[in-house]
């Protein structure tokens, strides 16, 4: 009897100690995980040294020179100064599409599917125009090498089409744009994993200008933006313009319903990349102040003193072909101001 009591006693103690050990392990593991996370946040491991795989990079070519000398800048970030940026970043190869003997034939098929006359009109060695015999204001310009194109209906000469008010809402416009991209095999992961934005347009004279609501709109615009790369956003020359853009009217006529499709998407080889040293963010700030900057969006205010609220890294995705996807410092300020400064260390740019 004593042996049974003693056995039960030690069994209970063993169970209690086992439970305590398990609880202690869970608690200790939790606190260790928190400690490691906090430690890495405060003392992050240094990234591997840059490999400068492509040698010296060609200088970024921005769309046009921007007159920035008229502005003076004041820094008012959350931290009170220019945030310290990473010492290096990835640079990606952007392969140049090769000419293809079947390219023109495929483009003619594309034009036919859009309801255009497949007879090409040569504008340059790579750019062809296609007309619509039943809707003369509608035409397609297509680059058979890059596969970038713009389809447009000249609404300026036919403003009566806006009397129809069957304008798609936000969700319908996104769905319609997405469906068209999928139909023509243009909705790859670069766009499908990216973001979209809808804006409303109102006819003023013969121009479509931004307005605040669907009820006031004569057309709706959908911009599809490329996905982030290495956790950083891609910035076109115009940060409000996506790589794929649709403008829909409310017309019941199918050929007047789509006022514009603009598609400009240069390929990125995500498997071919190098790492490059970056200039300090403080140096980028000095270049901004000195006017060595591309202003992508001017402030809506007439003031010439711009307050900078955010400074961070992104990638510049030009509408013109460039050999490499390179990082830039992005400066965001009051009243919509946005500017880019090349980020790669100057000794690695030519």
Please provide the spans of the model-predicted regions.
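Preferential activation on post-signal-peptide N-terminal prodomains/segments
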Residues: 1-211, 221-224, 230-236
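Sequence-level detector for tyrosine residue identity
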Residues: 9-10, 25, 73, 92, ...
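Generic structural hydrophobic/aromatic packing signal, biased to beta-strands
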Residues: 31, 151, 177, 222-224, ...
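A short, surface-exposed beta-strand/turn
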Residues: 139-155, 233-262, 330, 336-350
């Amino acid at each position: 009897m004593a042996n049974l009591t003693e056995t039960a006693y030690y069994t209970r103690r063993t169970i209690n100690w086992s439970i305590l050990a398990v609880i202690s392990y869970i608690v200790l593991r939790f606190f260790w995980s928190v400690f490691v996370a906090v430690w890495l946040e405060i003392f992050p491991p240094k990234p591997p040294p840059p490999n400068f795989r492509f040698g010296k990079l060609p200088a970024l070519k921005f769309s046009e020179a921007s007159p920035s000398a008229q502005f003076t800048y004041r820094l008012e970030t959350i931290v009170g100064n220019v945030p310290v940026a990473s010492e290096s970043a990835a640079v990606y190869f952007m392969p140049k599409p090769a000419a293809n003997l079947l390219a023109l034939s495929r483009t003619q098929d594309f034009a036919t599917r859009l309801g255009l006359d497949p007879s090409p009109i040569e504008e340059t060695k790579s750019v062809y125009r296609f007309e619509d015999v039943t809707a003369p204001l509608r035409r397609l310009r297509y680059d058979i090498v890059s596969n970038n194109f713009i389809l447009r209906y000249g609404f300026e000469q036919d403003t009566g089409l806006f009397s129809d008010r069957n304008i798609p809402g936000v969700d319908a416009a996104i769905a319609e744009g997405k469906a068209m991209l999928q139909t023509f095999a243009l909705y790859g992961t670069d766009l499908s994993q990216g973001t979209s934005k809808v804006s409303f347009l109102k006819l003023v004279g013969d121009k479509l200008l931004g307005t605040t609501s669907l009820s006031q709109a004569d057309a709706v615009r959908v911009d599809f933006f490329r996905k982030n790369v290495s956790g950083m956003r891609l910035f076109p020359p115009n940060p409000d313009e996506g790589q794929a853009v649709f403008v829909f009217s409310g017309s019941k006529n199918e050929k007047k319903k789509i006022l514009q499709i603009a598609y400009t998407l240069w390929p990125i080889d995500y498997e071919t990349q190098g790492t490059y040293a970056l200039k300090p963010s403080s140096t980028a700030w000095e270049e901004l102040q000195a006017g060595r900057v591309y202003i992508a969006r001017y402030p809506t205010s007439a003031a010439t003193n711009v307050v900078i609220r955010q400074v961070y890294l992104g990638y510049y995705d030009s509408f013109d072909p460039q050999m490499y996807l390179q990082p830039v410092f992005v400066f965001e300020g009051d009243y919509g101001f946005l500017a880019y400064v090349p980020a790669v260390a100057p000794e690695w740019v030519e």
